[in-house]
Amino acid sequence: RGLGDVYKRQVHAYETMNKECDIELCASMGFLNAEQLHRLHEAGVTSYHHNIETSRRNFPNICTTHTYDMKIETLKLVKAEGMWACSGGIIGMGEDWEDRLDMAISLAEVGVDSIPLNALMPIKGTPLENERRLTEPEILRTIAFFRYINPEADIRLGAGRALLTGDGIKAFQSGASATITGNMLTTVACATIRSDKNMLKEIGRETK
């Protein structure tokens, strides 16, 4: 699916950032074809984010505008291009333990390099407002078997850290290896960068 002028402007933005900033570039632009991904790669993008959101069985309950296979095919194109594939989803959206296991296996089969795991924070007025909040043991168990099934991938904590004690310190002891920090990308703010660095230093983890 072509993105026309919007896509061209985004490619230009990545080219500029690649020249002027000493950072790794990760794009999140939805469904792209092989040619578009190659152009992004040439522009300096080394990682592509494309969440599968949930299990194949539960996906139609969450999304009706596209299919699970479309998600998987995009990730395969990312890997074929030689870019890092970043894909995960949200737990607590009505799925059961088998769904979470299937999701972890789907990501392993594609060979994703980074897995952002979010825990749903039910918010009034949204379609999933009545979903039960996950307990900390449930979240930690999920992280642990995602780590077991995807031993080489980065497991990244995303939304839902407010459901964990101690800013999520036990999550890192359960298999998480990275986190989204600050209040820029989640509806409910995460911990601050400073507090996260202090927490990671406390358990002997390195930060940049």
PLM segments and residue spans:
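A short acidic, helix-capping loop that chelates divalent metal ions and anchors anionic groups
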Residues: 5, 57-62, 124-129
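Catalytic cores of alpha/beta
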Residues: 33-40, 94-106, 162-174
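Short, small-residue-biased leader/transition segments that mark boundaries at the very start
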Residues: 1-7
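Alpha-helical scaffolding segments of alpha/beta enzyme cores, especially the outer helices
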Residues: 9-19, 35-42, 70-80, 102-109, ...
